[in-house]
Amino acid sequence: MRHFAPIASILLSGLVPSALAAGDHPRVHFETDKGEIVIELDKALAPKTVENFLSYVDSGFYEGTIFHRVIKGFMIQGGGLTGNMQQKKTNAPVVNEADNGLKNLRGTIAMARTQEPNSATSQFFINTVDNQFLDFKSKTPGGWGYCVFGKVVEGMETVDAIENLPTTSKGMYSDVPATPVAIRRAFVETGDS
């Protein structure tokens, strides 16, 4: 029995680094009308943003929201409006962590916001091309940029399919997919997912 403790310790020590790594890089699945998108988040470089995003995922907030802004050769945006173009009530804004070193490259996910740098709440966008002009440059109103907090690791073909949809205007919104694309389900990947 006294040999069991060292063996168990060795076996468990092999599990700890992978558990910690998964903790720093949780994966979120979006099941959409066009297919699945899996996003790996970077909790180490964007801790407050990831915590904010996961709070929306865990609460079921994103389910039933649509990708309401789609611009070919730029990005797809979602996470705040229902299918009838109604804004959902959000939590308080999150501090802008765009100075974290992550870049707005194709396949990355970033927080959408107003002109106020620290105004991001639930809305996000996925870059469909490299958008360096959205990167952090300085802590000034014009230089803050948009906080990248993860990347698509599966389902970029779904992102591309959404990007290529015909768009129209609906009320005060332009670049809205003519056929709505909803997030049916959003969840954090677990060992059972």
Where are these regions (language model features)?
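Cyclophilin-like peptidyl-prolyl cis-trans isomerases
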Residues: 18-193
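Bacterial N-terminal signal peptides
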Residues: 6-17
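Positively charged n-region of N-terminal signal peptides that target proteins for export
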Residues: 1-4
